[in-house]
UniProtKB/Swiss-Prot annotation:
Keywords tagged on the record: Aminoacyl-tRNA synthetase, ATP-binding, Cytoplasm, Ligase, Nucleotide-binding, Protein biosynthesis
Protein family per UniProt: Belongs to the class-I aminoacyl-tRNA synthetase family.
UniProt subcellular location: Cytoplasm
HAMAP family assigned to the protein according to its UniProt record, in alphabetical order: Arg_tRNA_synth (MF_00123)
Record EC number: 6.1.1.19
Family annotation (SMART domains): Arg_tRNA_synt_N (SM01016), DALR_1 (SM00836)
Coiled coil: none
Main location: cytoplasm
Catalysed reaction, written as an equation: tRNA(Arg) + L-arginine + ATP = L-arginyl-tRNA(Arg) + AMP + diphosphate
Top class in the EC scheme: ligase
Protein name: Arginine--tRNA ligase
Species whose genome carries this gene: Geotalea uraniireducens (strain Rf4) (Geobacter uraniireducens)
Gene Ontology cellular component list: cytoplasm
Subunit field text: Monomer.
Amino acid sequence: MKELLRDLITKELASCFADGSLSSGVFPSIVIEKPAHAEHGDFATNVAMLLAKAEKKAPRVVAEILVSRLQESADICSKLEVAGPGFINFYVKDEAWRQTLIAIDRACADYGKSRIGEGKKIQVEFVSANPTGPLHIGHGRGAAIGDTICRLLAAIGWDVTREFYYNDAGQQIANLALSVQARCLGIEPDDPRWPLDGYQGDYIRDVARSYLGQETVEADDQHVTAAGDPQDLDAIRRFAVAYLRREQDQDLTAFDVHFDVYSLESALYAEGRVEAVVQRLIDSGHTYEQDGALWLRTTTFGDDKDRVMRKADGGYTYFVPDVAYHLSKWERGFTRVINEQGADHHSTITRVRAGLQALNAGIPVGWPEYVLHQMVTVMRGGEEVKISKRAGSYVTLRDLIDEVGRDATRFFFVMRKPDSQLVFDIDLAKQQTLDNPVYYVQYAHARICSIFENALERGFVLPAAESVPLERLVTLEEMTIIKTLASFPEILEGSALNFEPHRVTYYLQELAGQFHSFYNRNRVITEDAELTAARLFLLKCVALTLKNALTVLGISAPEKM
């Protein structure tokens, strides 16, 4: 509806410029919003106020000129008015709103989708966990947010590439190998010989057992057979990384999260990309040596202090391979890149961007874009749950999926803005009551399916969309539902463009609430065949929209509950 009104305004502006009613020739960005109060109409725009200066006219005068034209062409409106300092308020006819139902029925599974992205390439990197243990709840929230952002962007026409970056090099991987080796040798965590900063979860014991049993592990591009020699630390490292990559893959598959590309930090070193980037930075003149270390002048690009690239011992700091990795993204043609990461990565953003700018590779300032999510606190019985037996020191994603199910886990992870801390209430997520938001939404869909099953049993066949007497939908409740249905494409677009999946969960709860309230107050199947047909058609559109919105969140729309 907003797009239709925007097109009408643009058309009438052009007409006014053509005949001299308005003279500036300026086409401002036309913003159409829903007024705070219903008595001010369905939509409002401040376009006249934006034009006033260029036209050298009072905003209300410009608004009156536009309204006089729009009254002739905006036949979807019952009334237009100039309000306040120069707003134009639009009152859309009920019959125009009802036509939304026809559009929903025609679009079916595609309702809400658009081609805003025009098929342009965009890469989203998310999860990117170190292969040192099971995925924890922070990874889980990142997986849900990242995957939903991908689904949203695809829904509005972007060509999305999902990428996972494995930090499979560095000290953490060395600690993993030492921990598995200790288990292979029968050394326990309370033994003085246990490695410093070693991993103590039960999963280390599982990896060691599989390694000694000379098992074969397949994980993405790796096919690794354990050597079984507890003294071969390099073989242990390769096997442990492959084993834990496979476990992470299995957890993500159970979460219905999939990737198109897997990139390895170790490959950046093996292919010489890290050394090549360091040399390019040296050649660019943005580095200097001090205290035996190589520094990058990141302050030139907005950092609060310069950063060490290569330590005195010859090792690279962690942001250097990150710069090499992101350069590879740029060279692969991704001019738009989104990184979904935990908020603990905030400090690396400036360093990575500074390194990319220093390369003089034509990469724009502010590339890549970041979505950072805050921590998750898991509660059960009013108390925080902090550990998992298998992981040893944290709650795993698998723990949540096994306890509350995939749908509830995904919904809860995205139901708050990414930069807000999230309390995951296990007891609430398990409830099969309307207090549980995901149950509340899914039950609305199942309830509508049950209504249609009942109608079919009673011999009622819904006529073709064009034959449904939509004019029978006249109550405030019915029109409110229709207007909410009509807003779904805008919700989808806003959620995608702002990387805010929680907007869809809010929308789902609003629509489900309107349906439950309507159904509790009104009979759908009545003695009045026309009213029954109209209300069934309305509920068909509600069910379609609920399913489409749930699908974009990666959540099922059950027909029975």
